[in-house]
């Protein structure tokens, strides 16, 4: 998993 994708997934989970 790329760092950018990890940040995106983390942001999505954080928003949820």
UniProtKB/Swiss-Prot annotation:
Its EC number is 1.2.4.1. Its main location: mitochondrion. It is found in: Mitochondrion matrix. GO terms for molecular function: pyruvate dehydrogenase (acetyl-transferring) activity. This is Pyruvate dehydrogenase E1 component subunit beta, mitochondrial. It comes from Solanum tuberosum (Potato). Keywords: Mitochondrion, Oxidoreductase, Phosphoprotein, Pyruvate, Thiamine pyrophosphate. It comes from the Eukaryota. It catalyses: N(6)-[(R)-lipoyl]-L-lysyl-[protein] + pyruvate + H(+) = N(6)-[(R)-S(8)-acetyldihydrolipoyl]-L-lysyl-[protein] + CO2. Tetramer of 2 alpha and 2 beta subunits.
């Amino acid at each position: 998993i790329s760092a950018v994708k990890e940040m995106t997934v983390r942001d999505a989970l954080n928003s949820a």
